[in-house]
Amino acid sequence: MFQDPRERPRTIHELCEALNTPLQSLQVQCVYCKKTLEWADVYNFAICDLRIVYRNDSAYGACKKCIIFYSKIIEYRRYTSSVYGATLEARPKRSLCNLLIRCHRCQIPLGPEEKQRIVDEKRRFHEIAGYWKGLCTNCWRPRREATETQV
């Protein structure tokens, strides 16, 4: 499909432009399970702003099930450390808003509100495979004591 690695599209949107195909009708396989991505998986891959990988000059994405599954495996294998928000801001001397932090479960980039929520709730950011991770609003679970009911 794309012989020269420098000309290869890196995102789903760039691939759609290169193939002159709308996002709804794009046919891409999952790099892990090799199934053709359904439209919801294509949209999820685009929203997560993940990069396309190439195998034998063919473009591959990842379905949501595989993203969640392999994110957990990477978390177990490549976890480095956990820090609070103030410590993370002091390390690279940049504000949290300027750092790319993804959800460690679904890989969506966190917005400023989600990063601030982690700081306010006194939760930690995790360094996994050299990247900083947190939890997005969709994957957030309240702490156990917040969900317990009194009798």
From Swiss-Prot:
Further facts: Belongs to the high risk human alphapapillomavirus family. The cancer-causing human papillomavirus E6 protein has a unique carboxy terminal PDZ domain containing substrate.
Coiled-coil region: none
GO molecular function: DNA binding; PDZ domain binding; zinc ion binding
A Pfam family: E6
Subcellular location: Host cytoplasm; Host nucleus
GO biological process: DNA-templated transcription; regulation of DNA-templated transcription; symbiont-mediated perturbation of host apoptosis; symbiont-mediated perturbation of host ubiquitin-like protein modification; symbiont-mediated suppression of host cytoplasmic pattern recognition receptor signaling pathway via inhibition of IRF3 activity; symbiont-mediated suppression of host type I interferon-mediated signaling pathway
Signal peptide region: none
Chain span(s) of sequence motif PDZ-binding domain: 149-151
Gene name of the encoded protein: E6
Family per similarity comment: Belongs to the papillomaviridae E6 protein family.
Zinc finger (unnamed): 30-66, 103-139
Binding partners and assembly: Forms homodimers. Interacts with ubiquitin-protein ligase UBE3A/E6-AP and thus forms a complex with human TP53. Interacts with human NFX1 and MAGI3. Interacts with human IRF3; this interaction inhibits the establishment of antiviral state. Interacts with human TYK2; this interaction inhibits JAK-STAT activation by interferon alpha. Interacts with host DLG1; this interaction leads to the proteasomal degradation of DLG1.
Cellular component terms per the entry's GO annotation: host cell cytoplasm; host cell nucleus
Name of the protein this chain belongs to: Protein E6
Keywords: Activator, DNA-binding, Early protein, Host cytoplasm, Host nucleus, Host-virus interaction, Inhibition of host innate immune response by virus, Inhibition of host IRF3 by virus, Inhibition of host RLR pathway by virus, Metal-binding, Modulation of host cell apoptosis by virus, Oncogene, Transcription, Transcription regulation, Viral immunoevasion, Zinc, Zinc-finger
Database matches in SUPFAM superfamilies: E6 C-terminal domain-like
Functional description taken from the UniProt entry: Plays a major role in the induction and maintenance of cellular transformation. Acts mainly as an oncoprotein by stimulating the destruction of many host cell key regulatory proteins. E6 associates with host UBE3A/E6-AP ubiquitin-protein ligase, and inactivates tumor suppressors TP53 and TP73 by targeting them to the 26S proteasome for degradation. In turn, DNA damage and chromosomal instabilities increase and lead to cell proliferation and cancer development.
Keyword DNA-binding listed: yes
